[in-house]
Curated annotation (Swiss-Prot):
Record keywords, A-Z: ATP synthesis, Cell inner membrane, Cell membrane, CF(1), Hydrogen ion transport, Ion transport, Membrane, Transport
Example GO molecular function: proton-transporting ATP synthase activity, rotational mechanism
InterPro entries for the chain: ATP_synth_OSCP/delta_N_sf (IPR026015), ATPase_OSCP/d_CS (IPR020781), ATPase_OSCP/dsu (IPR000711)
Record-given protein name: ATP synthase subunit delta
Ligase listed as a keyword: no
Function comment: F(1)F(0) ATP synthase produces ATP from ADP in the presence of a proton or sodium gradient. F-type ATPases consist of two structural domains, F(1) containing the extramembraneous catalytic core and F(0) containing the membrane proton channel, linked together by a central stalk and a peripheral stalk. During catalysis, ATP synthesis in the catalytic domain of F(1) is coupled via a rotary mechanism of the central stalk subunits to proton translocation. This protein is part of the stalk that links CF(0) to CF(1). It either transmits conformational changes from CF(0) to CF(1) or is implicated in proton conduction.
Residue ranges the record marks as coiled coil: none
PANTHER family: ATP SYNTHASE DELTA CHAIN
Subunit structure: F-type ATPases have 2 components, F(1) - the catalytic core - and F(0) - the membrane proton channel. F(1) has five subunits: alpha(3), beta(3), gamma(1), delta(1), epsilon(1). F(0) has three main subunits: a(1), b(2) and c(10-14). The alpha and beta chains form an alternating ring which encloses part of the gamma chain. F(1) is attached to F(0) by a central stalk formed by the gamma and epsilon chains, while a peripheral stalk is formed by the delta and b chains.
Topology term for the membrane: Peripheral membrane protein
Family to which this protein belongs: Belongs to the ATPase delta chain family.
Location relative to the cell: Cell inner membrane
Principal location class: membrane
Length: 183
């Protein structure tokens, strides 16, 4: 819980700094953070280094500097990462990137969601479903599509903290419960 609060504060601070320069800078900062967070996710040993209290802040600075050089991130993100190293918060980088993405989506008016189906949808059908959902939501929608044969048929749509379960499995479960109750 505390890590999330800390990550949110740092993400808001970086977002406010980028907002002064415009949406283009916000996008650049977001992509730089995503690259670094992706590197941390791909190499769990880096996360262990950043969480280890025995390793000094100077050593962590050296590690993050090498990572920053490798990915060629902006000076703002470089300085931000050095600040995180000095404050002992490099272990929060992935959480910071995730919340920064939420802030960026809110700024752009984008909502993210996941559409789960029992079978793979053709690209034309995906575009059609996405367009219909965008029209209904009145906002731009970034959808990820996944396949889960366990739902048997229909769709499960997750957007934010809302879930619309229109799957055959859910409908059969409701029918089963109704039969048990005698309805």
């Amino acid at each position: 819980m505390t890590g999330n609060i800390v990550a949110r504060r740092y993400a808001r601070a970086l977002f406010a700094l980028g907002a002064k320069s415009g949406v283009g800078e916000l996008d650049k900062l977001g992509s730089d953070l995503a690259a670094l967070a992706g590197a941390l996710d791909a190499a769990p040993e880096l996360g262990r280094i950043f969480r280890n209290p025995i390793i000094t802040a100077g050593e962590k600075r050296n590690v993050i500097l090498k990572l920053v050089e490798k990915y060629g991130v902006s000076a703002t993100v470089r300085n931000f990462c050095l600040l995180l190293a000095d404050k002992g918060r490099l272990d929060c980088l992935s959480d910071i990137q995730a919340f920064y993405g939420v802030l960026l989506d809110a700024e752009k008016g984008v909502i993210r969601g996941e559409l789960m189906t029992a079978v793979e949808l053709a690209e034309a059908k995906r575009a059609q479903v996405k367009a219909a959902l965008e029209q209904q939501a009145g906002r731009k929608l970034e959808l990820t599509f996944s396949v889960n044969k366990d739902i048997l048929g229909g769709v499960v749509l997750k957007v934010g903290d809302r879930v619309l379960d229109a799957s055959l499995r859910a409908q059969l479960g409701i029918l089963k419960d109704n039969i048990k109750r005698g309805e």
